[in-house]
UniProtKB/Swiss-Prot annotation:
Effect listed in the UniProt record for changing residue 260 to L: In EPP1; enzyme retains 52% of activity
Outcome recorded upon mutating residue 283 to I: In EPP1; enzyme almost inactive
Primary localization: mitochondrion
Effect of residue 139 to L: In EPP1; enzyme retains 18% of activity
Function: Catalyzes the ferrous insertion into protoporphyrin IX and participates in the terminal step in the heme biosynthetic pathway.
Gene name tied to this protein: FECH
Regulation of activity: Inhibited by nitric oxide (NO). The 2Fe-2S cluster could act as a NO sensor.
Protein name: Ferrochelatase, mitochondrial
Length: 423
């Protein structure tokens, strides 16, 4: 039972659902790069971010012509309203790509029902729901507008959102794409760094859809399954880091320690050969190269739960350790997240940058703004799709290689599905 509890907690963390009760915050629509100075809280809310988010409402895409190319933007998603929380948890606990539980079909509904009230309260206190759909819609709108200019031969382009655990579900998005009569479909993960528990699960859902309905796709599928070192992605991260460094006192700026924080993984997953740690490290290395190694830095890992070994060092322990060693000016950079959600808005902004920082005696701590509505990020997405179309490749070479100790037979079927497509 101890192992079972650890698996359940790990699953919640992997889906970005915090088990702890968050403090009240203003809203998830506002990125809050908090700074503590001499133990006193000085909340610095980025006005530009707030303006972006206020205008980032999902809109129906105007279609003057029948879409020719569809881009399916894949993500786990998050409950958009409090009423979505139960179904979100239920689908999460039923996902065998994420975890395997005994009598899962019976245990999952029990766990979801038991957890729903507490999770609803958490989302209520950060604005009533997750911002992932809002930001994905805004990013998709910018992406397809640019794509129509970059690649007129494959236009019109239309983006579709495919979430694993909330509407619009991946399966619902595929059905809409089939109804639209697309010629080309691109499964585009919104996780820059590949993991079997995130991108892998979303790609498996596409394979399972066609396997269950018993028919072949009417459109030609390919996938952008990872993009950890894309030059515009790296530029976005570098720009946001430089922007936050400017807020530190001039005399302290060169001493600021940059902590790149990514969601951790259990070592049992890593030791099967999941490429996630290497790809996150590659992103960090490229960002620091772009910054010409302007400051000392470390890659740290957040959201560990349970007694089992996870990737380390942990973000909170790293903050404590740095303070104990006299390094009290810290910049947190969420390097594996492209938009704000509960792990940035609560875990980084409140738990670490307010509560923990005050306890440790941090002088200055800030968090780099997430990519959210940055126009350069939409340009990055468009460039990735455009380059993918021009390459005429079905997927990356890495996707053709299974983890050396993979235990999920569906992964092999999914790889076969994508590599057997004809463009």
């Amino acid at each position: 039972m101890r192992s079972l509890g650890a698996n359940m907690a790990a699953a919640l963390r992997a889906a970005g659902v915090l088990l702890r009760d968050p403090l009240a915050s203003s809203s998830w629509r506002v990125c809050q790069p908090w700074r503590w100075k001499s133990g006193a809280a000085a909340a610095a809310v980025t006005t530009e971010t707030a303006q972006h988010a206020q205008g980032a409402k999902p809109q129906v895409q105007p279609q003057k012509r029948k879409p020719k190319t569809g881009i399916l933007m894949l993500n786990m998603g998050g409950p958009e309203t409090l009423g979505d929380v139960h179904d979100f948890l239920l689908r999460l606990f039923l996902d065998r790509d994420l975890m395997t539980l005994p009598i899962q079909n019976k245990l999952a509904p029990f766990i979801a029902k038991r957890r729903t009230p507490k999770i609803q309260e958490q989302y209520r206190r950060i604005g009533g729901g997750s911002p992932i759909k809002i930001w994905t819609s805004k990013q998709g709108e910018g992406m397809v507008k640019l794509l129509d200019e970059l690649s007129p031969n494959t236009a019109p382009h239309k983006y579709y959102i495919g979430f694993r655990y909330v509407h619009p579900l991946t399966e619902e998005a595929i059905e809409e794409m089939e109804r639209d009569g697309l010629e080309r479909a691109i499964a585009f993960t919104q996780y820059p760094q590949y993991s079997c528990s995130t991108t892998g699960s979303s790609l498996n859902a596409i394979y399972r859809y066609y396997n269950q309905v018993g028919r072949k796709p009417t459109m030609k599928w390919s996938t952008i399954d990872r993009w950890p070192t894309h030059h515009l992605l790296i530029q976005c991260f570098a720009d946001h880091i430089l922007k936050e460094l400017d807020h530190f006192p001039l005399e302290k700026r060169s001493e600021v320690v940059i902590l790149f924080s990514a969601h951790s993984l259990p070592m049992s997953v890593v030791n099967r050969g999941d490429p996630y740690p290497q790809e996150v490290s590659a992103t960090v290395q490229k960002v620091m190269e772009r910054l010409e190694y302007c400051n000392p830095y470390r890659l740290v890992w957040q959201s560990k739960v349970g007694p089992m070994p996870w990737l380390g060092p942990q973000t909170d322990e790293s903050i404590k350790g740095l303070c104990e060693r006299g390094r009290k000016n810290i910049l947190l950079v969420p390097i594996a997240f492209t938009s704000d959600h509960i792990e940035t808005l609560y875990e980084l902004d409140i738990e670490y940058s307010q509560v923990l920082a005050k306890e440790c005696g941090v002088e200055n701590i800030r968090r780099a703004e997430s990519l959210n509505g940055n126009p350069l990020f939409s340009k990055a997405l468009a460039d990735l799709v455009h380059s993918h179309i021009q390459s005429n490749e079905l997927c990356s070479k890495q996707l053709t290689l299974s983890c050396p100790l993979c235990v999920n037979p569906v992964c092999r079927e999914t790889k076969s599905f994508f590599t057997s497509q004809q463009l």
